[in-house]
Structures are given as C-alpha cells and as structure tokens.
A protein has these predicted regions:
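Short, solvent-exposed secondary-structure capping/transition elements
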Residues: 30, 67-69, 151-158, 328-332, ...
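Helix N-cap / beta->alpha transition motif
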Residues: 13, 136-138, 191
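RNase H-like nuclease fold core
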Residues: 3-110, 116-132, 151-152, 166-169, ...
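Inter-helix linker motif
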Residues: 126-158
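Acidic/histidine-rich catalytic cores and adjacent linkers
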Residues: 112-125, 143, 165-390
Length: 390
C-alpha cells in the first residue's frame, strides 16, 4: 500500500502502532476539563478475569448535552480516569473520585448504575458548596424492575428451566436454528428481549407448519422439543408487554436526556400502556418507570438538563473489548492506555499536537503507575522468577 501511495517509508510494525496509540491515549487523558466547567461524570466497572475490574470514569460538559431528539456524541466525551483493581469498596471508589476532583474539579452530576460503591462516595463531591447530584442509569433500573416483576415468579423460573433444557436438546439437530440465544447470568434482565423475541419466533413456526424454516422438520419433532412454549403463551404476552414498555422508554431517554418536563413527556409517550387495566403487566411497568423518571427529575435545579443513560459508556467498553480481542483472556494489559483514543477522531493535527506533550517515557511511567499488579504482570513475574533460577 505504501508503494502504491508513493510513500518512501517502511510499513509500521504492529508494536509501533500500539505504542503510538498508547502515547496518544495517555496524552488525551491529560486534556480533559478544568474546575470552572460544569461537568457530568459517568462511572462504571468492567470485569475481565477473576477479581480484576477497571473503574472507568468518562465525562462531558453539561453545555455539550445534545438537544432533544439527538443522542450523545462520543466526540463530546472524554475519558477522565482508568483505574484497574481487585477490590472496589466504597472507600476505594471515594479515593479515586477525590483524586480526579482535585485534578479537574468535582462534577455537577454523577451518573452510575446504582451500585452502592459507586453511588455513596459521591456525597463527598462538593462543587460551589453543593453536593454532586447522583443519578441512576435508567437501563439498569428497568432491568431491576423486570427482575422483580417477572424474574422472581415461579412461572418464569419454570420457563428458564425449559429454555436451558431446550438448548441441550436441539443443538446439533435439524432443529438447531431454533436454539434459544445464550444469556449471561449477571445481565440476564438487561438482555431478556432477545429471549422473548426468540419465543415469539418459535411460537410463529409452531403455529405455521407451512413455514420455510420447518422444512425437513416433522410435526412430531418440533412439538416434542419446542411445544412446551404453548403452555407459556399467556405469560409471554405479559412479559412482552414489560419489555416493550422498557424498549420504548430507553429509546426515548437516549434521545431526550433528563429535563424538567421529562415526566410529562414520558407519560404522554406511554399513554396507551398507562390506560390498560390495572392488573396488566405493561401498565405496572409503565407506572414504575414514570415514577423513576419523576424522582430523577425532581433532583434537577430549575431549568437544568442532565442525562439518564450510560449506554454510550457501555458502547465504549464494547469498543475496547474489540480492540483487546484475545488479550482480554489474560486480564487487563497496557492496551488500557489506548482507551481514551476510542472517543476521538484521530487526525494528523491531533496526533502532532498531543505528541508534543507526551513522550514514550511518559507512557511507560503511566503503565507503571496504573498497571503495577495486574494478572498479566503477576503471571509474567512468576515466569521470570522460575526461569531465572535455571
């Protein structure tokens, strides 16, 4: 490619590109905010292997929140802190919050998933005599509501038992294309929609013997392996109501943010659900979500705006996992230094500007300070110690 472009240089090696990206990432960490700006922080943990987690804090200026109808722009966000560790108690998170606040000033808002260790330390974040306003991610709250309303019922537990048995019964058979999707135990109710969608799909084919997807599958076989779903038809109708309400609400919040008129707007959006008979699951879920948004809205000063979704933070984690690929199997690595670059469009001018202030030695120092005792570092030390004596 270089020859085709007429560039008289060797193609950079994989290691060289990694070093440059880490250097740019460390430089981006130094270019964030100052104490005069009103900033919203988002904080979350990402698990890797064993007990290892990284505390990631990203932020944006409140003035950069998008207008209603638009989603957050990753370019407006900045990575503020990347802190790996094994123990994340409230005092550990508080230490990192204070360290960041001393550097760039405390936030006006802190948005997190509601975990106590992320939420409670925010009481010590004081800006202009006011405590930071703590907001909970709507998606996590909706998942908690779904677990309480649906997941704890005996019918749902029986349904999940059948789903597990069905996976084993249909894989590697002519019914393999009807196999249920896998669900992570930890985030089951944040991703239940895929399982409910699967149920709807299978019910369709159970009721339509002429469907192309049933070609080569006998009536007896499909009923034997998947006919149990018919017994849950009424339950699935109620569960799907809950999921549809959640989907509508999340789509709305990701384009509206939190404002002083959000409750009224959400109530209008969910009007058809709120008018259902009182025993319907869809109405119950809609009422609870409206109550949650109302409680969040009441925390805002008059005329203010904030955000109630960490979906963009989860997207950033997803990008990083793609960057890591097989490296993630060995715990967190020096590639964490690249994470801030995933929020930025990399241009030649940006690289020149950032590289003026950060050298290769600064990257190595950041790695020593940030990743002193990771799983990978301990594993490498174990090998060095063993083979040094041979």
């Amino acid at each position: 490619m270089f020859e085709f472009l007429g560039v008289d240089q060797k193609v950079p090696s994989h290691d060289a590109i990694a070093q440059w990206t880490m250097r740019l990432g460390v430089a981006e960490l130094a270019e964030t905010f100052d104490s005069t700006q009103e900033v919203l922080w988002m904080a979350d943990h990402s698990s890797q292997i064993g007990k290892e987690k990284v505390l990631l804090i990203i932020g944006m200026r409140v003035d950069d929140l998008p207008p209603p109808g638009e989603t957050l722009d990753l370019e407006k966000l900045k990575v503020l802190a990347i802190v790996p560790g094994e123990k994340w108690k409230k005092e550990d998170v508080d230490r990192e919050y204070q360290r960041l606040a001393e550097k760039i000033g405390p936030p006006v808002y802190l948005l997190c998933d509601g975990a106590v260790e992320l939420r409670d330390p925010a009481k010590n974040l004081i800006k202009d005599g006011k405590q930071a306003i703590v907001l909970q991610n709507l998606k996590h709250h909706a998942a908690n509501l779904l677990e309480k309303q649906v997941g704890r019922s005996e019918r749902f537990k029986a349904f999940m038992t059948q789903v597990g048995l069905t996976r084993n019964r249909v894989q590697q058979t002519e019914l393999g294309h009807f196999m249920p999707p896998p669900l992570k135990q930890k985030s089951r109710f944040m991703n239940l929609g895929s399982l409910l969608r699967w149920s709807t799909m299978v019910m369709h084919h159970l009721n339509h013997p002429e469907s192309d997807s049933r070609e080569g599958v006998t009536e007896e076989r499909i009923e034997e392996k998947l006919g149990w779903l018919r017994d849950f038809a009424d339950d699935l109708a109620q569960w799907n109501q809950c999921q549809e309400v959640i989907n509508e609400t999340l789509s709305w919040i990701n384009q509206s943010g939190l404002r002083c008129d959000s409750t009224a707007e959400l109530r209008d959006l969910l009007a058809s659900w709120l008018e259902l008979p009182s025993g319907q699951s869809g109405r119950q879920m809609a009422e609870k979500l409206v109550d949650f948004v109302a409680a969040s809205e009441q925390q805002l000063p008059a005329g203010s705006r904030a955000w109630l979704s960490t979906e963009i933070l989860e997207s950033l984690f997803g990008r990083f996992k793609q960057l890591e690929r097989q490296h993630s199997k060995g715990g967190f690595t020096r590639l964490l230094a690249c994470l801030p670059t995933l929020c930025r469009r990399v241009t030649a001018d940006r690289v020149r500007s950032r590289f003026k202030h950060v050298q290769a030695g600064d990257v190595q120092q950041w790695i020593r300070d940030t990743l002193p005792n990771t799983l990978t570092a301990r594993r490498n030390a174990a090998y060095r110690e063993a083979f040094a004596q041979q």
